[in-house]
């Protein structure tokens, strides 16, 4: 390493942009040198510069020059003290020992530490025409701070603290006895009050006579000279001013009135912009180095009870008399007394003891005591209240805590506490929502500005979750928030000696506690509006009340939400119906454009036809909703009846939802068998349509399931009878709506819906009723045929054999999927999935379908494995029964089926997977059916809009037709893809089945061969025993044995050929 240490200097700008390039011709590095990047402190940098400027340094002995010494990864750099300092003044001790050094051989010593670099750098040297690479920089040297740095920092902090303590204002109360002295003024001072004030300020700063409050001027020349000296000395005094104490000087009781006198006193007062925190003056402007009259009057007015006029005349009465006058209540303004050192030689106060005592009193009542108090608080509380004000970056947070005071052990806890109470985004810490409960608005260390800032931030982060207008744009204000356009709420000076901030303000401020109590006592937070309206449920044929008809006919231009009972379950991602997520990617933008175009066209049509009747229709529709459905009962009129065109008309109760579930089951069972796919329809087919079918289905069900179905059937009969009794309270319009019938029969659970706004006439509704009746009649015929087939099957299976029972059990479990009979009772309640009315609901349904489909596929694979295992056992049992040769294969397979059945029944995981599979199967089928129904409705509505008269007058819209065509093509592709996947799965299953059958046939042949060989061995043993018993016929037996052997060999040959 080189002995010379060069200072960092900027290289000349010899290279301009665009006129040079970088190319590496050769790379020469000197391995004998090691390059280190050095980070200097200010004192070390100054020491290097002083050493370079010292001419005597070159003539020093080698032992007295600058030295650097390495001790492992640490070391010391020593510089000899120069003979002269930076100003050319010779040092007293020369190269001797320095007070700030480390002792020893004199000069200055700096310790350092060497660490490895995190990255790799290269040291480059600029030459005449090129840049030379000297080598890689792999080490970093950090110079340690010396003791003189700590001393200078300690001195600066002491000066700053003294300056901060001196910036305070003392409040003089009217009942104090030591306000000031009573001084009589000469009559000549009455005419020249302004000149007297200026002369007073000059005399108080330049003369040594301070025994009286107002100096008696014997001649005018002296006063003129003093005025001249005042103008020059005040400017110099203000330029060098650091702090001015507001002590108890002899002029404490003087009131401030006119502009000239206020400017004279303000020239001695500190700059208000440098005063901060509690108990200081903020917001006053400085014009030409002095305050204006408004600032002085506001300073005076904040000490009294809203005084509007100052102390205009300095003569006639003393400051004490002016304070005790009563009516004018002139305020006592603190007059700033100068410090000891003055440009003219110094001002000696005759009341030094009182000044020192007042200084100590002011230092105790200033903000320094608050800072010490906040440092004693828990660091977690301090961080919570700081983050409640605004989002802090980590350096800002550490700087704030360092200024307020922090312990060393608390410094190590800050990172963990921040991770617990805040979230980090964009390198800033934001307070968590749940931590706002720990924020105290009456935190004693907040300033008035911070209290207002907290009140503005808190409503944004603590909006009540049950508020009805939490998501609306008009709920931005809260009882505790402060609107930007309104004046700030009044607040008072809470701390000792505190003065309100505002120039020229004349009203006293209240505390934030009074403000909060006033606002909370007058304005109560909104509560959720609960509608106690109960809608009567009509029978299955008319599952649509008259409210829907009145709403659809009266307020066709309004958008009404579907009313349904929220399910009793944990809130999921679909509970928040007000959120709009753009990441669903279910529909293309053209579909949204189509819907918005159709809505805009319909709205313009309705505005042209009914420009003035929309609001009245809305009110009439809502009133008919409350009148006709309640049957004239007026006790449930608490629901909102005016302006409900864009809000739901209330929630149903849980009992209403149960009542509306079962009466519509017959229509849903017939409709769902044709509208849903064959494989998916049976999993959510409603209750049985006849008693015989339900009775036969109970024979094959477990006892729990049969009890469940019997309970549902009894409940359905009970509710149906109750609904017939309630028919009288429903108006004639309740049975004239066929659109609700179609939607209710096409759905798969008991719920109620409000159809989309439309302008259908009564004739179209009657046509829909007729069409619905025809569909019900057509769908009842296949269900009757299925019931007859089931009856025949059960009559044949009245007395099955045990083998038939085992085969039936294995076959039933192998086919125990969604292919249940149509008379099965729905076990799941999907009432929360209402029919789709908007594209947003369709997106949510499609998203939930996609999220559950992966789990459904996994469960399907597990169920298929169990089903395939039982199917193989069933086929093996059937084949063993057909070719029963008495070898025990049939009994072995039967025992295997029983063992497998018991294992699956005892395995809880398989049962849970099967139940979850059935639920997802029914749920996905239900959602798919709702989406298909909405798409069909949308297509029909789009096609029906074209031949209308209004559209004919305006001309056809090609965008709508194109969007409809794209939507149809999109659904066709989806259906084709689903069918393709289904075919591939079926082919795969068929192929696996054929392979399994081939393997089973091969194993069966091997077992037959082994059995034949065993039979041959048994026959041979029998023949050998015959030879030993009968010796006389041995020759014949030998011949017979040979023939038998030939026969056996021929049989084995035949068997081997067959194998």
Curated annotation (Swiss-Prot):
GO MF annotations, alphabetized: chromatin binding; cis-regulatory region sequence-specific DNA binding; RNA polymerase binding
Family annotation (Pfam families): ELL, Occludin_ELL
Comp. bias regions, Gly residues: 494-505
Compositionally biased tracts (Low complexity): 188-241, 258-273, 322-369, 467-485, 543-562, 612-624, 640-650, 660-697, 759-795, 807-824, 1002-1026
InterPro entries: E3_ELL-like (IPR042065), ELL/occludin (IPR031176), ELL_N (IPR019464), Occludin_ELL (IPR010844), WH_DNA-bd_sf (IPR036390)
Subcellular localization(s) per the UniProt record: Nucleus; Nucleus, Nucleolus; Chromosome
Biased composition (Polar residues): 598-611, 698-707, 738-751
OCEL domain mapped to chain residues: 827-939
Record region (Disordered): 171-277, 314-374, 450-509, 522-581, 598-827, 968-1059
UniProt biased composition (Acidic residues): 1027-1059
Entry coiled-coil feature ranges: 853-883
GO cellular component, one term: chromatin
Amino acid composition bias (Basic residues), ranges on this chain: 990-1001
Main location: nucleus
Swiss-Prot/TrEMBL keywords: Chromosome, Coiled coil, Nucleus, Transcription, Transcription regulation
A single GO BP: snRNA transcription by RNA polymerase II
Family listed: Belongs to the ELL/occludin family.
Function, as annotated: Elongation factor component of the super elongation complex (SEC), a complex required to increase the catalytic rate of RNA polymerase II transcription by suppressing transient pausing by the polymerase at multiple sites along the DNA. Elongation factor component of the little elongation complex (LEC), a complex required to regulate small nuclear RNA (snRNA) gene transcription by RNA polymerase II and III.
Subunit structure comment from the entry: Component of the super elongation complex (SEC), at least composed of Ell, Cdk9, cyclin-T (CycT), lilli and ear. Component of the little elongation complex, at least composed of Ell, Eaf, Ice1 and Ice2. Associates with RNA polymerase II.
Name listed for the protein in its UniProt record: RNA polymerase II elongation factor Ell
Organism listed in the record: Drosophila melanogaster (Fruit fly)
Gene: Ell
């Amino acid at each position: 390493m080189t002995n010379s240490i060069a200072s960092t200097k900027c290289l000349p700008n010899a290279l301009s942009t665009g006129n040079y390039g970088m190319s590496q011709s050769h790379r020469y590095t000197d391995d004998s040198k090691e390059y280190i990047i050095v980070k200097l402190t200010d004192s070390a940098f100054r020491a290097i510069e002083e050493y370079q400027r010292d001419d005597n340094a070159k003539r020093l002995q080698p032992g007295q020059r600058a030295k650097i010494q390495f001790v492992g990864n640490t070391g010391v750099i020593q510089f000899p003290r120069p003979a002269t300092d930076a100003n050319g003044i010779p040092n007293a001790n020369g190269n001797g020992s320095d007070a700030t050094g480390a002792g020893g051989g004199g000069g200055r010593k700096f310790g350092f530490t060497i660490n490895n670099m995190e990255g790799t750098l290269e040291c480059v040297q600029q030459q005449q025409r090129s840049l030379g690479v000297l080598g890689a920089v792999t080490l970093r040297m950090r110079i340690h701070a010396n003791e003189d740095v700590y001393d200078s920092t300690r001195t600066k902090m002491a000066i700053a603290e003294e300056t901060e303590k001196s910036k305070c204002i003392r409040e003089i109360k009217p009942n104090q006895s030591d306000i000031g002295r009573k001084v009589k003024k000469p009559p000549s001072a009455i005419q020249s009050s302004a000149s007297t004030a200026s002369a007073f300020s000059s005399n108080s700063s330049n003369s040594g006579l301070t025994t009286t409050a107002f100096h008696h001027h014997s001649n005018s020349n002296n006063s003129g000279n003093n005025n001249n000296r005042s103008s020059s000395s005040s400017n110099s005094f203000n330029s060098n001013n650091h702090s001015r104490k507001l002590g108890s000087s002899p002029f404490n009781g003087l009131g401030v009135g006119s502009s000239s006198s206020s400017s004279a006193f303000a020239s001695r007062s500190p700059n208000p912009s440098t005063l901060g925190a509690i108990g200081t003056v903020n917001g006053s402007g400085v014009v030409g180095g002095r305050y204006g009259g408004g600032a002085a009057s506001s300073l005076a007015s904040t000490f009294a009870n809203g005084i509007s006029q100052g102390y205009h005349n300095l003569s006639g009465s003393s400051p004490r008399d002016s304070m005790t006058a009563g009516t004018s209540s002139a305020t006592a303004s603190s007059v700033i007394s100068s410090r000891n050192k003055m440009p003219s030689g110094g001002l000696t106060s005759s009341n030094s003891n009182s000044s020192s005592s007042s200084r100590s009193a002011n230092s105790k009542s200033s903000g320094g005591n608050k800072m010490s108090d906040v440092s004693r608080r828990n660091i977690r509380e301090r961080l919570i209240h700081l983050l409640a004000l605004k989002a802090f970056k980590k350096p800002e947070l550490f700087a704030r805590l360092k200024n307020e005071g922090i312990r060393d052990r608390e410094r190590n806890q800050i990172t963990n506490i921040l991770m617990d109470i805040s979230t980090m985004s964009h390198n800033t810490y934001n307070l968590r929502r749940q931590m706002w409960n720990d924020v105290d608005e009456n935190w004693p260390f907040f300033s008035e500005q911070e209290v207002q800032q907290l009140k503005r931030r808190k409503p944004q982060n603590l909006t009540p979750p049950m508020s009805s207008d939490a998501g609306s744009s008009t709920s931005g204000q809260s009882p505790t928030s402060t609107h930007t356009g309104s004046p700030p709420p009044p607040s008072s000076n809470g701390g000792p000696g505190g003065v309100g901030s505002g120039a020229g303000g004349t009203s006293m401020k209240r505390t934030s506690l009074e403000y909060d109590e006033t606002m909370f006592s007058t304005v109560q937070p909104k509560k959720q509006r609960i509608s106690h309206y109960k809608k009567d449920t009509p029978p299955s044929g008319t599952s649509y009340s008259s409210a829907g008809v009145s709403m659809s006919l009266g307020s066709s231009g309004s958008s009404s939400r579907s009313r349904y009972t929220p399910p009793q379950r944990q809130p999921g991602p679909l509970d928040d119906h007000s959120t709009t997520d753009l990441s669903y990617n279910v529909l293309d933008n053209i579909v949204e454009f189509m819907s918005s175009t159709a809505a805009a066209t319909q709205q313009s049509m309705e505005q042209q036809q009914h420009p003035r009747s929309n609001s009245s229709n809305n009110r009439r529709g809502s009133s008919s909703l409350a009148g006709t459905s309640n049957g004239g009962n007026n006790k449930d009129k608490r629901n909102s009846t005016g302006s409900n065109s864009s809000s739901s008309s209330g929630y149903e109760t849980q009992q209403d939802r149960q009542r509306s579930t079962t009466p519509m089951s017959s229509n849903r069972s017939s409709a769902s068998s044709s509208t849903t796919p064959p494989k998916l329809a049976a999993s959510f087919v409603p209750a049985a349509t006849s008693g015989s079918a339900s009775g036969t289905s109970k024979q094959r069900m477990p006892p729990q399931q049969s009890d469940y179905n019997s309970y549902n059937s009894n409940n359905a009969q009970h509710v149906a009878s109750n609904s017939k009794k309630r028919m009288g309270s429903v108006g004639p319009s309740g049975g004239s709506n066929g659109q609700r019938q179609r939607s209710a029969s096409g759905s798969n659970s008991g719920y109620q819906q409000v159809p989309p706004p439309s302008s259908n006439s009564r004739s179209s509704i009657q046509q829909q009723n007729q069409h619905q009746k025809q569909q019900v009649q057509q769908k009842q015929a296949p269900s009757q045929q299925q019931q007859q087939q089931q009856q025949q099957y059960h009559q044949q299976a009245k007395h099955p054999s045990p083998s038939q029972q085992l085969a039936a059990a294995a076959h039933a479990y192998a086919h125990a999927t969604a292919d249940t009979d149509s008379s099965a009772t729905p076990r799941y309640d999907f009432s929360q999935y209402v029919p789709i009315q908007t594209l947003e609901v369709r997106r949510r349904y499609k998203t939930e379908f996609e999220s559950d489909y992966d789990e459904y596929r996994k469960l399907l694979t597990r169920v298929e494995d169990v089903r395939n295992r039982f199917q193989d056992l069933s086929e093996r049992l059937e084949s063993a029964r057909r070719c029963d040769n008495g070898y025990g294969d049939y009994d072995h397979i039967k025992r295997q089926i029983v063992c497998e059945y018991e294992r699956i029944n005892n395995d809880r995981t398989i049962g849970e997977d099967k139940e979850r599979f059935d639920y997802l199967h029914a749920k996905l089928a239900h959602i798919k059916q709702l989406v298909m129904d909405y798409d069909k409705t949308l297509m029909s509505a789009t096609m029906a809009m074209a031949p209308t008269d209004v559209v004919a007058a305006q001309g056809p819209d090609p965008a709508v037709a194109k969007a409809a065509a794209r939507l149809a093509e999109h659904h066709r592709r989806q259906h084709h893809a689903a069918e393709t996947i289904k075919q591939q799965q079926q082919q795969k299953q068929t192929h696996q089945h054929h392979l399994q059958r081939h393997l089973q046939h091969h194993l069966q042949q091997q077992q037959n061969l082994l059995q034949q060989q065993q039979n041959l061995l048994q026959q041979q043993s029998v023949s050998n025993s015959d030879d030993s018993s009968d010796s006389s016929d041995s020759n014949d037996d030998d011949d017979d044995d040979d023939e038998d052997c030939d026969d056996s060999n021929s049989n084995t040959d035949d068997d081997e050929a067959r194998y």
